Amino acid sequence: MTGSRATTCLMAQRRTDRLALCVAPAMTRTSNHHAVIIGASVAGLFTARVLADHFTIVTVLDRDDLPEGGTARKGAPQGRHAHALLAAGQRTLMELFPGIADELLADGATLINFNEGRWYQAGGYRSKINKKRAAISASRPLLEHHLRRRVAALPNVQIRSSVAVDGLLYDGRRVRGVQVCEDGTLSGITGDLVVDCSGRSSRASAWMEQIGYPTPKVDHVKCEQVYSTRIFRRSPSDMDATFAITIESPADGKRAAFVVPIEGDRWIVTLGDRFTAPITDEATFQAFALGLPAPEAGHVVTRAEALTPVMNHRMTSSQRRRYEKLRRVPAGFVTLGDAICSFNPIYGQGMSSSALQAVALGRAVARHGIADTELPKGFYRQAAKVIDSPWKIAVGADFAYPETTGPKPIGTNLVNRYMARVLMATRVSPEINATMLEVQQLTSPPSVLFRPSFIVAVRKAARQAERQMSDEPAAPLVPAAAA
């Protein structure tokens, strides 16, 4: 499926999602207002697009020498690994950038359907669902390339690379811009709103302390996630699925695998583990894939031509800066994306959360006005609501592993026991699997999983799944003639 047919499919899916995307109406730009965004990341680019509707001028500053095409940025080494926009993020992408789905597909991205993939979890494969769920699959660098191109084409947006932000300009009442270093020279850039989208390593707390404001409490959940990736040439004979996900049950191990198609007729294969060293050599990469409880990753890495060496990355903890709990925050300055909350990447929530936070910022600007000193507090309250659901999902799942440490939500052990039953039920119930998928894709809140009628259905389906469990081998993914 390509071209306008793909857009029609994705738009139809978007209309059926339960939660409507509310993009704030654009304000009339009657004054010469300037927004300065730190970081041309996914978060920064979504933010630039949203604020372009509210500000006369939007300037995006990035310390990297930004690439022209779809290659990974130096400042985003995680971009070499498998990424996904969840349904909520994809919906936001299409609302803010009409036609970008066709542009991505024309540049080699793949349209995949959930029912054409294989998702192994809780000791078995999750069932097919009763409605089509399409998604665009591409590398993160390709997505960033198209976002940069679309944002740079906006008449009131400028993206400047190789510009490092060293601090805030503050007049005693509000932030008035940023201090930058460009070509070895320090200078200032004034603005009515500064948005820090510089990522997990954000220096916003230090900057706030320098101008006399308290710094946010930081929640660290130590998950010690490591992941290793190789890219392979893609052939239809590799497996009879458009993508594959394998996640071991916590009782059995900590391993996971993601096999997804990307542009250039390639597979990106990312293997994840916890509380261990990342894979660095080809033999260990192959042995890991072959040792998983489902065969898809092993089939691809042994049958397909490898195009890259093993690339690895480590993330020691998820972290959430609690700006919404501060009584005093500087006017004219907010943080967004990983600068607020950096999730365990294994759940794929980061880019989608950033997109939704950008929309929340647009709503806050429309409600409060650019000059309102209450704008930052209003935004942080809305951002916290965006972050709460994926944070609960990720942190709850992380605490299924006894080595995880950090602030543990009350009732986590009980919830995790119930979630194990939900995942068991997804093996036999398309309805339960569809609801679980909506929660994981951030289009429904986790609370839907705890409705009395749903709990009853889970109890029944989980018992059915247990009765059906057997030692039968998984169906072969590669025709015998291709073996």
What are these regions (language model features)?
Residues 154-288:
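Predominantly flavin-linked oxidoreductase catalytic cores and closely associated redox partners
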Residues 84-85, 130-149, 203, 279-280:
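Short beta-strand to alpha-helix junction loop
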Residues 121-140, 271-274:
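Helix-loop-beta segment of a Rossmann-like dinucleotide-binding subdomain
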Residues 362-483:
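C-terminal helical "tail/cap" subdomain of flavin- and related membrane-associated enzymes
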Residues 8-35, 53-55, 66:
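Extreme N-terminal leader/targeting segments of oxidoreductases
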Residues 33-60:
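N-terminal Rossmann-like FAD-binding beta1-loop-alpha1 element of flavoenzymes
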Residues 137, 227, 277-386:
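FAD/FMN-dependent oxidoreductases across multiple families
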Residues 50, 70-117:
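N-terminal FAD cofactor-binding segment of flavoenzymes
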